[in-house]
Amino acid sequence: MRTCHRASHRDVSPEEWGTVNARRAVVIGGGPAGLLAAAALAPAVAEVVVLDHDELPEAPAHRRGVPQSRHAHLLMPGGMAVMEELLPGADLRGRLVAAGARETALSSDLLALAPTGWFRRWRHRTFVTMTASRPLLEWGVRRAVLDTNPRVTVRRARVSGLRGSARRVTGVRLAGADGGPPEDLDADWVVDASGRGTRLLPWLDVLGVHGIRERHVDSGLANATRVYRVPPGAPDWPMTLVQADPWSGRPGRSGMIVPIEDGRWMVSLGGMRGSEPPKDPDAFLAYALNLPSPLVGRLIEAAEPLGGVHVSRSTSNSRRYLEDARLWPERLVAIGDAAATFNPIYGQGMSAAALGARALAQAVRQHGIEAPGLARRVQRTVARAARGAWTAAVSTDVLYPGVEGGRPTLGDRLAAAYSRRLNHAATGSYTAACALWDVTTLRTPPARLFHPDALLHALTGSPLPALSGPPLTAAERDFLSGLKPWV
């Protein structure tokens, strides 16, 4: 097995460990969820070994093991706040901005057409969201974790199973390299952060843990993404979003322009089952021009493409109700997509994973890593942390025709009617918009939507008339009026 990264080559002295005994934690998966879990465990153990089947690059680069690697990614303010809490002194935000990541204040820097109309741009600069390519975000988190946690190392290895019993996990089994024999790696703690492709349930079956309930809700979303060079004269063009309409009874269609590093736009088109975006470049442009607003299409028609169109259909919502298992092994926790996976169109996966890692860190700090029942307690807390993102994604996706795995209940329809009223109010009310952004950016649980101020605006509607078009600045209008197709 090759060591791909090491945070530091110096030894960690027993004095630095404090009361830590010589014990090892193993984290399966080297993405943001896994690295943040490693940071959560590092203060309580002598060594954290992060295992990933990919060779993790030294610089930002796409890798095969990340199905959404070439599509748009947002790091919500709720997720960023949690990551910085988990990584004190790492200056994650500063690292990412220095590497070229962009920051967008949803309140003032976003052009967004909702099904209920155009959102206004307010003078308040709040709900700052970071946008960058997935490779840059992942690299930034990885370097921040490794540079500030000398007990964490990363190895390239493929995990083929768990070791232990239904009562306690004692390590992992690694597939043999180059056809060689398998290797057993002892561990006092194991965290599964292996993502959408997790094999956790079959591994638990082998240990004697059976009957874990799963739910899958698939709207059939296909994501098509192409990267463009930002046209001259538009270096600060705001993030632009045309949202899908879940209330129309027709397959949803959406488009977004996300500013990313190196003077580029990442343009993602989304279509639910029956309205999937195409891979052909000419058809990709035509699809964008035929969205409810042609703004995304007009902008990319004038931009230089920097590659082909990448399509992904790995977009379903999946949840494993691990917290309800009748029997749960000590010293095993699953976080991130290994526990609950969300439709990536909502941009909440990375932030939800951070919330799960924080739940692990808080539990270890409060109860001690050897506390009986700690793994089950953490798993239940992880489930609560993911509930908001799951509810938001699934309650919307079940409204689309052709959805698999669920149909809207009466409660879903009532929630949809309320959501539509609140969205309409948010087009003309900063207070109502803040309620939506609080929830969609994972700063607060969904109950925030039913606070008195949000309820009042949902009942009374928008206090301002609907906008007839996107709220552009004078400079943006001049740029748009002078657009010419790129050749």
Residue ranges of model-derived segments:
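Active-site-adjacent segment of FAD-dependent monooxygenases/related oxidoreductases
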Residues: 70-140, 225
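Predominantly flavin-linked oxidoreductase catalytic cores and closely associated redox partners
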Residues: 148-287
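Extreme N-terminal leader/targeting segments of oxidoreductases
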Residues: 1-25, 43-45, 55-56, 483
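C-terminal helical "tail/cap" subdomain of flavin- and related membrane-associated enzymes
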Residues: 7, 361-487
